[in-house]
């Protein structure tokens, strides 16, 4: 069978393989031919993330279709600073160090639409472990860092069609729907975190059996459920903070969930109305339909890659990108699935 691979740089790789080839074997083949690390590859076909153990023919891949390949490099672990010691450290220590050697920059050409691929790997900073660990937890004050690793750290605001697409993508990977719904709720609809829960099999029991029904139903009464909350003190603080820096939404929601989980649930279930409230209360004298969103250089590059990959307009890509919690792979999957539906 003919398998066409398309990456975000519009490069196309074509392979002639047997239908019983597994996805993992295809990733290894891509690695051999085009030097792409298999563990960094995410393959998507018809809005589904391909599982390593399944065969290509099980996904009914056609000769005219193509597989989207996303490359996601692992995040670098920040260097750990040893606690100050009152005695000088010996010249030799048994503390392990971890280093990663950068791979050479290869040049490869694809079968069709020949182009050049130059993947590079940045060495991981050395992680020095102190000889005597301090059992007392410490909090770092480094800007941009966070002291929590809770799976509820981020929110993708998925709702309605977007949420159902996310649920379908995950259930298609073989997980039970009720477990998927529970994992998504626990992670504020963050698909990547939810999958981590599902893979580990350690999903905390739901506190409220009606929560999953509320997630599916969309919740909220009236045209805009936030009209009654317009003067709520928590909501006003949230609105002011987000208007200044939208990137702090996940952290604020996590804190707000401790004091007003009902409000957070309404925000998750009604993201469009939530955004319209910002637009309606925008800068005086400005366009009431205009909302300025600040993005980092990395986020801007991801949005541009998604535009080039899908051919969709920038506003559509941005909306999907933030709805998917800035997950580039999930955004690509959602955009392709939306395009197929239309």
Swiss-Prot record:
GO cellular component term of the entry, any: cytosol
Renumbered residue ranges of the record's region Disordered: 77-157
Organism in which the protein naturally occurs: Dictyostelium discoideum (Social amoeba)
Subcellular compartments: Nucleus; Cytoplasm
Biased composition (Low complexity): 77-151
Molecular function, one GO term: proteasome binding
Purpose of the protein: May play a role both in proteasomal degradation of misfolded proteins and DNA repair.
Classification via Pfam families: UBA, ubiquitin, XPC-binding
Stated name of the protein: UV excision repair protein RAD23 homolog
PROSITE patterns with a match to the protein in the record: UBA, UBIQUITIN_2
Annotated ranges, domain Ubiquitin-like: 1-76
Presence of the UniProt keyword Cytoplasm in the record: yes
Top-level taxon of origin: Eukaryota
């Amino acid at each position: 069978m003919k398998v066409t691979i398309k990456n975000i740089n519009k490069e196309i790789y074509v392979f002639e393989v047997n239908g019983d080839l597994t996805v993992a074997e295809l990733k290894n083949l891509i690695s051999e031919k085009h030097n792409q690390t298999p563990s960094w590859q995410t393959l998507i076909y018809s809005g589904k993330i391909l599982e390593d153990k399944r065969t290509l023919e099980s996904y009914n891949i056609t000769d005219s279709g193509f597989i989207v390949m996303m490359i996601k490099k692992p995040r670098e672990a920040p260097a750990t600073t040893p606690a100050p010691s009152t005695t000088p450290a010996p010249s030799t220590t048994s503390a392990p160090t971890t280093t990663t050697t950068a791979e050479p920059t290869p040049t490869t050409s694809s079968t069709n639409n020949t182009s050049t691929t130059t993947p590079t790997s940045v060495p991981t900073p050395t992680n020095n472990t102190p000889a005597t660990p301090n059992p007392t937890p410490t909090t770092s004050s480094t800007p941009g860092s966070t002291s929590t690793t809770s799976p509820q750290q981020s929110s993708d605001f998925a709702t309605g069609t977007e949420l159902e697409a996310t649920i379908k993508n995950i259930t298609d990977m073989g997980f039970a729907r009720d477990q998927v719904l529970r994992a998504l709720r626990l992670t504020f609809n963050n698909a990547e975190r939810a999958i981590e829960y599902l893979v580990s099999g350690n999903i905390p029991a739901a506190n409220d059996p009606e929560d999953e029904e509320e997630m599916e139903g969309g919740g909220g009464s009236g045209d805009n459920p936030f009209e009654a909350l317009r003067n709520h003190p928590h909501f006003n603080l949230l609105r002011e903070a987000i208007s200044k820096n939208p990137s702090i939404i996940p952290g604020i929601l996590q804190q707000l969930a401790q004091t007003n989980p009902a409000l957070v649930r309404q925000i998750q279930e009604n993201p469009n109305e939530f955004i319209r409230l910002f637009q309606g209360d925008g800068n005086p004298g400005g366009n009431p339909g205009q909302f300025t969103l600040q993005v980092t250089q990395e986020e801007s590059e991801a949005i541009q890659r998604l535009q080039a990959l899908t051919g969709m307009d920038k506003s559509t890509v941005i909306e999907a990108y933030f709805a998917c919690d800035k997950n580039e792979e999930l955004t690509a999957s959602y955009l392709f699935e939306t395009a197929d539906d239309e």
